Amino acid sequence: MAVSDKEPVYGIGPTLLSASVMSFAILGDALIYVVLPVNAAAFGITIFWVGILLAANRIIRIFTLGPIGLLAQRISPRKLAIVGAIGSTISTLLCGIAEGPTILLAARLLWGLSFAILTLVIYSYAVSDRRKAGTNMGWSRAIHSVGPSLVLLVGPWAAIELGPTNIFIWLGIITGLSLPIAFLLPKEGRKIKSKKNRWFPKPKRFDLFLLIIGLTVDGIFAIGITLTIAESSSVGTAMITGGALIGLRRVLEASLSPVGGILGDHFGPNRLLLISTLLLALGFALLTADFPLIGGFCVVVARALIAVLWPAEIARRT
């Protein structure tokens, strides 16, 4: 992507505001990884569909970034944020009122599109000053992680009291708060301009890298924790414990993101991404060798660093 020199350079304010939109928008997605695997029957689906639904939002992002990038050339980040806030609210509400795989799949695909849009909005504000792109992305990731951290710690308790589906109706209402925040963003913003106007660009190796990270850490790791606990305890205990463990990842992510962003600006995000990936591989190796605490900690720390470093790496490449 090429950026015009005439585009405005923003301070940290719009970046943090856009991250706040994401913090509310992502509430339903954060909790569904804990609730859905052990409550599949309540949603009218089988465990087979659990895997599909939790992966659908990531897969669609790979093939829609081209169209979204073209859309971003025509409208401001503020308008994109409003669209993303509306989409995420509808998606979360659908997870609460829908039953069966068809509507749930539509909800997850809608969330994937909304997440891609909001990520692009944060990116557009954060990299307006390329010298501080990593730092800005680090702070935005910290704000972005507040909502998921809280919902993973409190949400499982609420799901037990309200029911595994009703909790998403309440989360949908809370997610609606992202809309007024989106309206606070600057009316004119830095628009992303693509080098090639391709609607469906061929996924690059870095795109596949991010997909693998998402499927292994956010998918298999998160689902595996919850299902493993459910085998030896109750569903409620599995949700609470799984939520606490995944919530810890979010808390560490929020804590490490500013540091990771600053280090990325100083040493280069590509080097730190390599180190983080090696740490991630080490973590999974330790997990398979029956060292769950050390292995899980390595996975959590590596995932937190990758989360903040990949946008800075994209900014460096464009």
Predicted ranges, named:
Residues 10-38, 202-221, 297:
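Pair of pore-lining "gating" transmembrane helices in MFS-fold secondary transporters
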Residues 34-48, 223-241:
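Short amphipathic helix-loop junctions that connect adjacent transmembrane helices
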Residues 44, 76, 97-102, 268, ...:
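Helix-breaking motifs and short loop linkers at transmembrane-helix boundaries and internal kinks
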Residues 64-76, 256-268:
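Helix-to-loop junctions at the C-terminal end of transmembrane segments
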Residues 79-93, 172, 271-286:
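Structural signature of the two symmetry-related core transmembrane helices
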Residues 91, 102-110, 294-302:
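Paired small-residue
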Residues 109-144:
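Cytoplasmic helix-loop-helix junction between adjacent transmembrane helices
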Residues 270-310:
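C-terminal transmembrane helical hairpin of 12-TM major facilitator-type secondary transporters
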